[in-house]
Amino acid sequence: MNDKIIEFINNNRLLSLAMQDNDGVYIANAFYAFDILNKALIIASSPNSKHVRLATKAPNIAINIAKDNKVPLLKGLQIKAIFEKANEKQKKIYFAKFAFARLMNAEFYALRIYFAKFTNNILGQKIYFENKNIII
């Protein structure tokens, strides 16, 4: 994964994730921590939330992380990922970034990235990442 993508992920903390719904698509927001070794975004949520129920049923999801609303300064990351339960190491990564999460009654999930497109209008280019080791 390109260093510019890693830096962008590490410098942000809120993502939007989209998943399939009976009526089309559904979207939710979540704070995240980054598991760089496994190229996964870690989130906390209730297992009863609509987005977790939908993503558990159809784990191929889309993610957006964006910054700034001025076109010349626009930076954003469009991601395709697999939704799965987080492991113990990933929970620790999340707690390191969001200590308050220890007080939450939540489950933790890993959004394992298999494709990413980073747009940075300042650079005037797009940077891609693809993990062909993940079977969809």
Where are the predicted features?
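Charged, amphipathic alpha-helical segments
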Residues: 1-3, 45-51, 93-94
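Helix-adjacent hinge/juxtasegments
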Residues: 51-80
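A short, aromatic/hydrophobic, helix- or strand-capping loop or linear motif
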Residues: 19-21, 66-68, 104-109
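Charged, gly/pro-rich active-site loop segments
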Residues: 73-136
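Extreme N-terminal tail/first-helix region
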Residues: 1-15
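A generic structural signal for nonpolar/aromatic side chains embedded in well-ordered alpha-helices
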Residues: 9, 54-55, 94
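Solvent-exposed residues in well-ordered beta-strands and their adjoining turns
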Residues: 35, 46, 66, 84-86, ...
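Short beta-strand segments
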Residues: 12-47, 55, 61-65
